[in-house]
From Swiss-Prot:
InterPro entries: VQ, VQ_8/17/18/20/21/25. Its main location: nucleus. The keyword Nucleus applies. It is found in: Nucleus. This is VQ motif-containing protein 25. The gene is VQ25. It comes from the Eukaryota. A motif (VQ) lies at residues 50-59. GO terms for cellular component: nucleus. May function as negative regulator of plant defense. One of its GO terms (biological process) is defense response. It comes from Arabidopsis thaliana (Mouse-ear cress). PANTHER family: F16F4.1 PROTEIN-RELATED, VQ MOTIF-CONTAINING PROTEIN 17-RELATED.
């Protein structure tokens, strides 16, 4: 008898435990109902009037009406954009700006051209790159860079670049 009780406990432990007050919920399938407000009619039309008929039944506007109205809207929008551009240009002028946030044309040219634009065409931000000119020329001596113009200059200066990473030995192999 004890063996049967032990077997019952073992089988109940292996099944999923369910709370005493739990129950399964079954969902009913939704019912699809078609309700006709008015009796369906067969409407006969030709191909030329089909689009107009569909648009009138669905409540969408006709293309001919919107095509007449669109150019006016586009013209008004274009006119507004032009006016906005003119107004922003006027606001950029020094007399219309705050001193903290507005730079006049001379300050802008000095910032970009450097030295008030006299004789310099590279720009004010490029002035510091002159220090790197020698560094960029020395890059040609390194044979591991896959630049064709640098490889050509390295092979011509093989005696001067032989002390760096094998110099002409590697550049001759890959050239």
């Amino acid at each position: 008898m004890e063996a049967t009780i032990f077997e019952k406990r073992r089988s109940s432990l292996s099944s999923i435990a369910v709370h005493k007050q739990s129950y399964s919920i079954t969902k009913s399938k939704p019912k699809i109902r078609i309700i006709h407000i008015f009796a369906p009619e067969i409407i006969k039309t030709d191909v030329a009037n089909f689009r107009e008929l569909v648009q009138s039944l669905t409540g969408k506007p006709d293309d001919q009406r919107t095509s007449k109205a669109k150019p006016r809207r586009d013209m008004h929008r274009l006119h507004r954009q032009v006016q906005d551009m003119i107004n922003t240009e006027k606001l950029r002028e020094p007399e219309h700006c705050d001193q903290e946030f507005c730079l006049n044309a001379e300050e802008l040219s000095m910032t970009w051209n450097g030295n008030n634009g006299a004789g310099e065409s590279s720009g004010g931000f490029l002035n510091g790159l002159g220090d790197f000119e020698g560094f960029i020329q020395e890059l040609g001596e390194f044979p591991y860079l896959p630049l064709s113009s640098i490889d050509a200059s390295a092979s011509s200066n093989s005696s001067s670049s032989s002390h760096l990473h094998g110099g002409s030995v590697f550049s001759d192999q890959f050239a």
